[in-house]
Amino acid sequence: MTDTDLITAGESTDGKPSDAAATDPPDLNADEPAGSLATMVLPELRALANRAGVKGTSGMRKNELIAAIEEIRRQANGAPAVDRSAQEHDKGDRPPSSEAPATQGEQTPTEQIDSQSQQVRPERRSATREAGPSGSGERAGTAADDTDNRQGGQQDAKTEERGTDAGGDQGGDQQASGGQQARGDEDGEARQGRRGRRFRDRRRRGERSGDGAEAELREDDVVQPVAGILDVLDNYAFVRTSGYLPGPHDVYVSMNMVRKNGMRRGDAVTGAVRVPKEGEQPNQRQKFNPLVRLDSINGGSVEDAKKRPEFGKLTPLYPNQRLRLETSTERLTTRVIDLIMPIGKGQRALIVSPPKAGKTTILQDIANAITRNNPECHLMVVLVDERPEEVTDMQRSVKGEVIASTFDRPPSDHTSVAELAIERAKRLVEQGKDVVVLLDSITRLGRAYNNASPASGRILSGGVDSTALYPPKRFLGAARNIEEGGSLTIIATAMVETGSTGDTVIFEEFKGTGNAELKLDRKIAERRVFPAVDVNPSGTRKDELLLSPDEFAIVHKLRRVLSGLDSHQAIDLLMSQLRKTKNNYEFLVQVSKTTPGSMDSD
């Protein structure tokens, strides 16, 4: 190598920093005024700071980034460097490929920037992982974010390979693509940060999240007491504060609270909700106020509710305790039912009635008789798909809990009301109480399930879906007498002779499920004879468990006499004899005296 070549090489090194362009970021070495930095957007400033080696840029603001970049430039321009001539002499003596710092232990600020610009992408990826937990909250470690980081790393590696192969002329393109990649990564970090902040804000406000987290109650929060019936759905629960139907003031209950406290559907719950403070903006995504405190379940403590038995594990028995319905001399409906179809605690009775046969009046008389003669029983009247005026009449005439869903409501409301009502009755039975449920009617409930349930593809005659018959049968099958204490009595009406094939199919499904049946006759009702009871097909299974031996023998004689007559003559004879006596006891004594030969014939 001649002296001319050495001089040329030295001039190329000093005058045209072409080799340094591949390693030194030109925008950092250039003396850019502060105004040009102020015009850059935040992702560009972060990318520039990352190339300069500034760490933690994801949490910096714009003015902080500008200050950090200017500090790096001042260190690079004004630092005490090694004598320039000595460096040039050393570079001239060494081969051009060994253009490295004079000492490996110490580096000047300019050389630090060069080395940091070469390692900008690995450091940025590590900085992203380090800043992830602090910047993006609890969601920084999700699988989606890891996938984004892996894809970004692969793209960075490809960019580095292309930049290495292209040489010094493509150094600017490599840095430009690196800047775009950095901006994309920083945008991802910004999105992660926003998601993390939103998640933390939701946790602080007590908004429910996907895992059903409970709402947090602070010391300075003002609470308001609430009470209602718990309705547990698939992944959430509500306290129905306005009855058994959904309302605008229902209270949300997290599934964690339901499982932790052993809460069940139909529980009577009391607790508290947080009252929004003055000037506090309501959460637009939070439609219902969450329950922040649980005080009692079914009038008892929460610990007692965890120890209660399950309704399905209780032992069912035949009814053995009678519910007497006779109230007064002139109330013949209940007197006839006591003689023809005696009812016990835990009975599953059906009142089979054609239209306009007086079934609603019979239900009212039964309800009033139960509240008068058996005040220990909890009475619930469930009216499904009923006329609004009949609901009002029932509420005013019955001293009990009337749960209604009128016919102008959608079928889903009919089914939800019936399900929540029977679940409420089960919760009372688990406490050892006697509950009587009067349902009007099981046929209309079957219609509602047929209209509300999705089609299964198997349609029976009359357009009845096969899956729509099970839920009302489950409702009726809940009636039972519990050996451990408590009972659930269900008296439901079933409509026949309506001219609808679907009603006939529904009735045939329930025909063998009841253990007591009271059949009404339309022809008797057309003669204006009430109650229009068809005596011969009506009766109770295992009625000897409800009647005393003497009473059972006399009733047996009476039914033998009435069986020889047609339905019209039988009810006329029975009604005429009941009007002559003050009560059923006197009537049975009279029957035993007037038919002595029947006992001998037996």
UniProtKB/Swiss-Prot annotation:
Residues bound to ATP are 344-349, 356-361, 387
| Keyword Repressor carried by entry | no
Bias class Polar residues marks the residues at 100-120
The misc remark on file is:
Was identified as a high-confidence drug target.
What does the activity regulation annotation say? The antibiotic bicyclomycin inhibits ATPase activity but does not affect termination function.
Q: Where is the composition biased (Basic residues)?
A: 193-206
A biological-process GO annotation: termination of RNA polymerase I transcription
Q: Relate the protein's function as given in its record.
A: Facilitates transcription termination by a mechanism that involves Rho binding to the nascent RNA, activation of Rho's RNA-dependent ATPase activity, and release of the mRNA from the DNA template. Shows poor RNA-dependent ATP hydrolysis and inefficient DNA-RNA unwinding activities, but exhibits robust and fast transcription termination, which suggests that the transcription termination function of M.tuberculosis Rho is not correlated with its helicase/translocase activities and that these functions may not be important for its RNA release process.
Family to which this protein belongs: Belongs to the Rho family.
State the residue spans of region: Disordered: 1-35, 76-216
Provide the assembly information: Homohexamer. The homohexamer assembles into an open ring structure. Does not bind NusG.
Q: Which organism is it from?
A: Mycobacterium tuberculosis (strain ATCC 25618 / H37Rv)
Spell out the protein name for this chain. Answer: Transcription termination factor Rho
Gene encoding the protein? rho
